[in-house]
């Protein structure tokens, strides 16, 4: 229950679709500093963005101008404005689904 209060769902306020000719492109999530802090995320870090149809890794960008509880996503397939998403820091410390280090 404590983890649920730290990772509240976020509303997609805006969606940015880029073109191949754009310099700045690729999966990204823009969020308010308070929302990032509660998820232990920093600017430039990768995070999982879980949408209603799929999930994808995206670069986190911290933007003070975005309303708390809202996010703007860029180039994340399967997410549309007004949908609810969760942004989760990857768990790199647990051993789940990693290939074995020795085969002996």
Stretches with model-predicted labels:
Residues 1-104:
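Long, contiguous, secondary-structure-rich segments that constitute the structural scaffold
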């Amino acid at each position: 229950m404590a983890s649920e209060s730290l990772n509240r769902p976020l509303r997609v306020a805006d969606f940015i679709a880029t073109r191949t000719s754009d310099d700045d492109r690729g999966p990204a999530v823009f969020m308010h500093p308070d929302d990032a802090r509660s998820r232990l995320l920093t600017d430039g870090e990768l995070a999982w963005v879980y949408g209603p149809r799929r999930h994808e890794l995206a670069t986190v960008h911290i933007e003070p101008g975005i309303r708390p509880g809202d996010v703007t996503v860029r180039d994340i397939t399967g997410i549309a404005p007004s949908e609810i998403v969760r942004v989760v820091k990857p768990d790199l410390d647990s051993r789940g689904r990693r290939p074995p280090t020795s085969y002996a």
